[in-house]
Amino acid sequence: MDFVMKQALGGATKDMGKMLGGDEEKDPDAQKKEEERQEALRQQEDERKQKHIRMETEREKVRQQIRDKYGLKKKEEKEAEEKAAMEAPIEGSLTRPKKAIPAGCGDEDEEDEESILDTVLKYLPGPLQDMFKK
């Protein structure tokens, strides 16, 4: 019967104690190896970050050369100028700035409408002009 049990379980009986939290074989160098591995990972991460910083500085140099060549401004500079331009007229005002109404929208003067009507009437023949004027 023991033979059958050993064959059925295979070599698992030896590891069964370890699975249940029994005695574990401890490698005396395991802690040292783990520390070395952690240190190597930290070094790799530092190297990666330094490489990334170098690449970004090189890219920024190229971007600046292009800006200088074509007379472009940085996005931050452009936004700062726009903000300053928006705030300049507001400084002396006590009310908020009025929104500009595009042409053709909203209330229009009646004089504009009459002048358009007069312009159209000029191109009509005489009898039709009389009909529209009445």
Curated annotation (Swiss-Prot):
<dbReference type="GO" id="GO:0005829">
    <property type="term" value="C:cytosol"/>
</dbReference>
<dbReference type="GO" id="GO:0016079">
    <property type="term" value="P:synaptic vesicle exocytosis"/>
</dbReference>
<keyword id="KW-0963">Cytoplasm</keyword>
<comment type="subunit">
    <text>Binds to the SNARE core complex containing SNAP25, VAMP2 and STX1A.</text>
</comment>
<keyword id="KW-0268">Exocytosis</keyword>
<dbReference type="GO" id="GO:0043195">
    <property type="term" value="C:terminal bouton"/>
</dbReference>
<keyword id="KW-0813">Transport</keyword>
<keyword id="KW-0175">Coiled coil</keyword>
<dbReference type="InterPro" id="IPR008849">
    <property type="entry name" value="Synaphin"/>
</dbReference>
<feature type="coiled-coil region">
    <location>
        <begin position="29"/>
        <end position="84"/>
    </location>
</feature>
<comment type="similarity">
    <text>Belongs to the complexin/synaphin family.</text>
</comment>
<dbReference type="GO" id="GO:0031201">
    <property type="term" value="C:SNARE complex"/>
</dbReference>
<keyword id="KW-0770">Synapse</keyword>
<dbReference type="GO" id="GO:0019905">
    <property type="term" value="F:syntaxin binding"/>
</dbReference>
<feature type="region of interest" description="Disordered">
    <location>
        <begin position="1"/>
        <end position="114"/>
    </location>
</feature>
<keyword id="KW-0532">Neurotransmitter transport</keyword>
<dbReference type="Pfam" id="PF05835">
    <property type="entry name" value="Synaphin"/>
</dbReference>
<feature type="compositionally biased region" description="Basic and acidic residues">
    <location>
        <begin position="15"/>
        <end position="85"/>
    </location>
</feature>
<protein>
    <recommendedName>
        <fullName>Complexin-2</fullName>
    </recommendedName>
</protein>
<keyword id="KW-0966">Cell projection</keyword>
<dbReference type="GO" id="GO:0046928">
    <property type="term" value="P:regulation of neurotransmitter secretion"/>
</dbReference>
<keyword id="KW-0539">Nucleus</keyword>
<dbReference type="GO" id="GO:0005634">
    <property type="term" value="C:nucleus"/>
</dbReference>
<comment type="function">
    <text>Positively regulates a late step in synaptic vesicle exocytosis.</text>
</comment>
<dbReference type="GO" id="GO:0043204">
    <property type="term" value="C:perikaryon"/>
</dbReference>
